[in-house]
Every structure is written in C-alpha cells, then in structure tokens.
UniProtKB/Swiss-Prot annotation:
GO terms for biological process: proton motive force-driven plasma membrane ATP synthesis. It is a peripheral membrane protein. It comes from Cenarchaeum symbiosum (strain A). Keywords: ATP synthesis, Cell membrane, Hydrogen ion transport, Ion transport, Membrane, Transport. This is A-type ATP synthase subunit B. Its main location: membrane. Pfam families: ATP-synt_ab, ATP-synt_ab_N, ATP-synt_VA_C. The lineage of its organism: Archaea, Nitrososphaerota, Candidatus Cenarchaeales, Candidatus Cenarchaeaceae, Candidatus Cenarchaeum. Belongs to the ATPase alpha/beta chains family. The keyword Membrane applies. The keyword Cell membrane applies.
Length: 462
C-alpha cells in the first residue's frame, strides 16, 4: 500500500524502538497516516501517535529495523489508514495490515473505510438476540453464543484454544434462517505453524469461501498487531452493516495484542500501570470489543469471540481481568481437564454467557434449553463437591446419591464436553446428551427442570 501527495519532512530527530520522531512538523493530526521512505528507496507505513512542540511521534507498522536518522524522510498524507472493502474480500487471505497474502491481486474496492470504525450510537444499538450454533456442545448447551454478543475464551499457554478457534470458524452457523453468514478470523502474533494450521483448516473444509483470514505472524513487527484486529473488524462491519450479513469475528491471541501495546507504551516512556501495561489498556481494549453488536434498522450483526492466553493461568491478570469487564461472559478452558485429555477442556463452573437467556428457548433452540442447562451446571457443581469429599473419606464413605452424582460428573466430561475436533453437533444432539447426562440421577433430584420437561425428556428409570 503506497500513498501519494502530502507534506514531506526530512528532519528525523530520533528513532526509538518502533517509533520515529519527526522534527519541525506543522499541521499534522493524531492518527494521520505517514509514509516513511528509507535510504534505499523502500517505503513503510506508520501513523501519528502524538504531536506537540513541532514534533510528531510516528508509530511505524513494519518496524524501524534498518532505518537511520540520516536519509530517512517522512510524508504526512493528510488522512487516516483505510481498508479497501467489497464482497470480494470473502475467501481471501491477508496479512496483518490488510494486504493480500494469497498471491492474488488486490480485491476491487467498493469503498475505503477508516480502520478505527465509526462509533455506534448507543440509542441505535439493538439488544443482542438469536442463537449462533458453533457445533461445540459445551458452548451451545451451557454458555450459548448470541448474535451481537462478545464472548471471550480464556485459555492458557499450550492448551487447545487454537484447535477450538479453528473448529468454531469451520462449524459456526445461524440455524433456521436463510440469512448470509460469514467468519472474519484474525490471527495476531501467532507462529508460522499455527497460521498454516488455520489456513489449511479453513481451506480443506471449504469454510474459507465464506471467511476472511488475517494472519499476523510472530516474526512480523509487534506494532503490526495493533492494526490487525482493527482491519479485521472494519471488514466485519462492512459485511454486516452494508451487506446485511451475520458476521462472527474470531480474534486470537489478544494477549499478543496487549503485549504490543505495552511495548509501544514503554518506547514512549509512559508511566506504566498494572504489570507494566499502559493505564489506558481498558480503554484501548474497549475500542475493539465494543465494535460488536447490532444496529436498529440494519439486518446484519457483528459477534466477537476474542481468545486470549492467561499468563501463568492467572484469571486476575490485567488482560483477562479487564476483558471480563467489557465483554458479556467468558468461556474458560481448564488446565486440569486439558491434562486429562478432555477436548475442549471447558471449565463450565467458571464460564458463563450473560446473554444466553436472550438467544435460547422456544422458537430459537428448544423450550427446555435454559432449565436443562441449569440442571447440568448444578449437577456438575455437586459432582465436584463429591469428588473433593471422596479425596478425604474415600469412595466407601459416600452415599448412594453421592456416587450417582460422581457418575454424572464423569458422564458430563466424557460425553457432553468431549467431542472430536471435526464433530459438528446440532443443538438437538447437544440437548439430547444433556438429558442423557442428568438421567443418571433420580427424578426427584432434577429440581431445576419443570415436571413437564422431565416427563417428556427424562431417560432414566426412576
């Protein structure tokens, strides 16, 4: 991407980390696009982070490696960074800055859109509703994803979140309607092998035809990670609000995004906040997460599933902590379940979807969905208590009902949580398994479900 025109300056005062400080600047604007010309004639893009006292601090997307103060020029082009968009972006693969990575020509643009997006008027926001089927029972059954929601996945280093992300991207759909559905997948700071896995997974399954894939690799400049989720969401907003599609945006790994933000903050010598992250981390994350939603009078929707790895599996770390304040629930992957070979290792007791009630029930999934979900959650919680008790007194000290709850816990992990990476379960199959699980209990223990549903769906003998 090159840009023409603008005002050129050759007085580069300093190069510090990913930043270039330009002297003698007049009439520059915050977030303005800047083209850096190197000694060898190469060009790199950047944007203005700060202006004042005749100086401009420019963040260079491709990094400053190889740049020198002498011979480097900066051209301020008078506009912000924009992403060219059209229906032709579907089925395409781009790098973290939105440039084609699949050896195909640039898609013909219908329009160019500011990557920072337009703020959604709160009065024009429509409440998220309607079910998105991921084909993953743990999510569909107990922490349902709703159109327009932002539901993060909290994972840990080395766990199976990338496999789960790819499975959701392949399988997700809106059921019972003829509405168009698309997936925008942004991989942020991932290894080459992970990027190839995402690409092959979408291509071989045929899901790439309805998807847009952005790949920012670990060896790309960290600064590029700040741009990747924004170009991805710009495409998603165009598909949703201009073309009327329901769009699922998967962002992985947002921890790499936050690390890049910390790197830039340190280079600017800003006063650090918790664990060295900038004090505006919450505000910055909200500019990404709040781009999910639905608008009154618009057919489409943007739903987000951001994925982040919790450093040291610490859910109180600033990144998951602040993410939880902005988003509407969380899906937490458990290390213990992962070690036991459960996939996906969803810890349902630490997970929830705050908007689940608005996307399920009669006319959306099934009339008993909420109650059987509550019953499974309650039974699993009781099973965990019984397991802890058995660790102290042994199985011989347990009552018959305790043993049945322990069996329900095992069944839930082995049948409801565990599924193959290519297994796409319908909501009917998921609800059937949930009834199979609690049918290991006597009817009088099913206190979260109405009697009429017990009579209709219960599969036990008593």
């Amino acid at each position: 991407m090159t840009v023409e025109g603008g005002v050129q300056y050759s007085r580069i005062a300093e190069i510090k980390g990913p930043l270039v400080i330009v002297d003698g600047v007049e009439n520059a604007a915050f977030d303005e696009l800047v083209e850096i010309e190197t000694n060898e004639g190469g060009r790199r893009l950047g944007k203005v982070l700060e202006i004042g006292n005749g100086k401009a601090i420019v963040q260079v997307f491709e990094g400053t490696t190889g740049l020198s103060v002498a011979g480097t020029n900066a051209r301020f082009v008078g506009k912000v960074m924009e992403m060219p968009v059209s229906r032709e972006v579907l089925g395409r693969i781009f790098d973290g800055l939105g440039r084609p990575k699949d050896k195909l020509p640039d898609p013909i643009a219908d329009k160019f859109i500011d990557i920072n997006g337009e703020a959604m008027n709160p009065e024009q926001r429509e409440y998220p509703k309607d079910f998105i089927q991921t084909g993953v029972s743990a999510i569909d059954g107990i922490m349902t994803l709703v159109r327009g929601q932002k539901l993060p996945i909290f994972s840990g280093s080395g766990m199976s979140h990338n496999i789960l992300a790819a499975q959701i991207a392949r399988q997700a759909s809106v059921v019972g309607t003829g509405d168009d559905f698309a997936v925008v997948f942004a991989a942020i700071g991932v290894q080459y092998s992970e990027a190839e896995y995402f690409r092959r997974s979408l291509e071989e399954s045929g899901a790439l035809k309805r998807s847009v894939l952005f790949l920012n690799l670990a060896n790309d400049p960290a600064i590029e990670r700040i741009i990747t989720p924004r170009v991805a969401l710009t495409v998603a907003e165009y598909l949703a609000f201009d073309l009327g599609m329901h769009v699922l945006v998967i962002l992985t790994d947002m921890t790499n995004y936050a690390e890049a933000l910390r790197e830039i903050s340190a280079a600017r010598e800003e006063v650090p906040g918790r664990k060295g992250y900038p004090g505006y981390l919450y505000t910055d994350l909200s500019t990404i997460y709040e781009r999910a939603g639905r608008l009154v009078g618009r057919k489409g929707s943007v739903t987000q599933v951001p994925i982040l790895t919790m450093p040291s599996d610490d859910i109180t770390h600033p990144i998951p902590d602040l993410t939880g304040y902005i988003t509407e629930g969380q899906v937490v992957l458990g290390r213990d379940l992962f070690r036991q070979g459960v996939y996906p290792p969803v810890n349902i007791l630490m997970s929830l979807s705050r908007l689940m009630k608005d996307g399920i029930g009669e006319g959306r999934t099934r009339e008993d969905h909420q109650e059987i979900s509550n019953q499974n959650y309650d039974a699993y919680s009781r099973a965990q208590e019984v397991r802890a008790l058995a660790g102290i007194v042994g199985k011989a000290g347990l009552t018959d009902i305790d043993l049945r709850y322990m069996g329900v816990g095992d069944s839930l992990e082995q049948r409801l949580l565990t599924q193959a990476t290519d297994e796409n379960r319908t909501i009917e199959e998921t609800l059937g398994i949930m009834w199979d699980t609690v049918s290991g209990l006597p009817k009088n223990e099913l206190t979260k479900v109405k009697d009429k549903y017990v009579e209709k769906f219960y599969k036990g003998s008593a």
